[in-house]
Structure formats: C-alpha cells, structure tokens
Amino acid sequence: MTLQEEIQNGESRTLEYKASLPYDSQKWIKTIVAFANGAGGKFVLGVNNQREFVGLAKSVDLFEIKDNIADTIGQMCEPQIMFDITAEMVDNAQLLIVNVFPGNATPYYIKSLGKENGTFIRLGATTRNADWTALEELSNRGRHVYYDEFACPSVKVEDEDIKYLCRDFSERAERKITRKDLENLNIIIGNEKDTATNAYAIL
C-alpha cells in the first residue's frame, strides 16, 4: 500500500498526520513515543484533517525542520527512539514523513513527565496515556519477561510432574530433557528452583 493510499484510509494505530508541525512539541512527541511503544508508525506532515495533501509551506526549510524534529525526539524522549525522516512529493505537495520503528526497550516516555505520566500508547487512531496495566506490560516486554515466565506460587512443584514433563519433552525433542533444562526454560524458577511459573501451570 502506498503512502497516499494509507492516508486516504485515515489515521490508524500506525499513522498520524498534521498539516504542519505543532508549535507545542508535546502535542506531537507523545505520538512518536506511542509509536515506539507499539508497532511503530508514520507521523506525516503536510496533510490536513480532511486528508487533503496541502503540503508544507514553501517558506519551510526542510533541512531545518528535519533537524528540529530529530533534536526534539532526542532531547525529550527516553530511552533513545529509532526513527528516520524522509521527504516525499504527493500530488505536488511536499510531505515530511517521520518513520518511527517499534522499540525493544519499552517503555518509551517523555522525560519531563516521567515514566508514569509520560508513557503513551496508541489505541486505534488516538494517542493515550498508558495506564498501570499497559505500563507494566511494556516494562515486562522491555525486560523480555513474558506471561508464561511469571511466578505462579499457588501451584506446587511436584517431583512426579517434573518427571512427566521431562519424559514428555524428551519424546518431543528426541533427546533427554532434564530438570536443569526446565530451569533454563524458566518453567520452574526461584533461588532454589522450586517455584512454578505460569508455563508450568499451563503444561
């Protein structure tokens, strides 16, 4: 799908556009943060709310606005967000596209607001503050911790269950699976390696 087709379909979880760059940086930087916390996205300048390609004003210095955007993202956001900025002509209108890549060090946030108040996510075509649930999920993702690795202390680790899992996994893997392998897979965790995880409970 071309950029023109994307814009004609309207704003989305991965697309937002403005006729010009808002004077208040926070009005657009939170969208950059939200894109980095999600699937990435494009922030396009030169398109109005009616999806018309009005282009940037001829008086705008493209190099200057690119530098301004890059500096603002670098100074206002934490951790460092990966992005690129390109210029494109569509229907004789000069557009500027900030392509934000999905980050793997979530949560990304506006430094001046702090992590709790400065973390944003995309909900449909809107940018919203991340609530505590979303913030926790982003934090876990940034630490590369997933649901099946969470401790599940309500489930007791039984020797018979360990033997069954080792036997079942050995048949599937066509090699001997030991208790140590289950520990390495975070199926059981803890200082004494005797705490079940959600993966253990599910299996």
Labelled PLM ranges:
Residues M1-L203:
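Conserved N-terminal catalytic/coupling substructures associated with nucleotide/phosphate chemistry
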